[in-house]
């Protein structure tokens, strides 16, 4: 799982999470749910010989109806430190990775056909999508999986997922 607006990243100080190593990278777990792993942004995991990076975060258009600190957190988008960690991890690999696991998409792949009518898109902070665009432009990758838009769609090597799930193409 990568973080989104409805979860606060475990590294932001919630003491219910433990950090541990999993497939070559760090993950967060909770004692009550030991089989649910929370990927740490910028960590690279070895999945049957394929390298995958986790990149969480996105802007919540419905945060006005959410409760701050309960169903929405202000740190929903990657911080400067997280962005730096992601870019450093990719830089160490020569900007080459097999799989990207992100919450939202690079801006160029946004599924505008499913945008909610009545939401003024000029007021939506797309800084994460713009940053992911810059990542995607520099990156050599095989497959990119993401969610956020509550739809199913494949565009080139990118797959937006919602109700569907798929075994990673390893």
Task: State each model region's role.
Residues 41, 57, 69, 165, ...:
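Active-site donor-binding loop signature of nucleotide-sugar glycosyltransferases
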Residues 11-29, 34, 47-127:
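Active-site-proximal loop/helix segment associated with metal-binding centers of metalloenzymes
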Residues 1, 40-41, 55, 102-103, ...:
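Short His-Asn-centered micro-motif
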Residues 1-23, 107-170:
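Conserved beta-sheet core of the metallophosphoesterase superfamily
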Residues 41-48, 154-156:
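Short acidic-hydrophobic surface loop/beta-edge motif
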Residues 35-37, 158:
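Short, conserved active-site loop motifs that form the nucleotide-linked donor/cofactor pocket
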């Amino acid at each position: 799982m990568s973080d989104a607006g409805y979860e606060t990243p475990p590294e932001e100080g919630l003491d219910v999470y433990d950090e541990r190593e999993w497939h070559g990278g760090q993950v967060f777990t909770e004692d009550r749910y030991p089989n649910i792993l929370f990927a740490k942004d910028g960590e690279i995991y070895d999945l049957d010989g394929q390298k995958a990076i986790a990149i969480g975060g996105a802007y919540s258009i419905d945060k006005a109806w959410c409760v701050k600190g309960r169903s929405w957190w202000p740190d929903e988008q990657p911080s400067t430190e997280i962005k730096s960690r992601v870019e450093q991890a990719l830089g160490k690999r020569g900007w080459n990775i097999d799989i990207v696991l992100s919450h939202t998409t690079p801006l160029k792949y946004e599924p505008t056909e499913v945008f909610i009518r009545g939401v003024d898109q000029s007021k939506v902070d797309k800084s994460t999508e713009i940053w992911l665009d810059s990542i995607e432009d520099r990156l050599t990758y095989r497959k990119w999986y993401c969610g956020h838009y509550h739809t199913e769609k494949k565009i080139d090597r990118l797959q937006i997922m919602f109700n569907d799930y798929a075994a990673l193409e390893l």
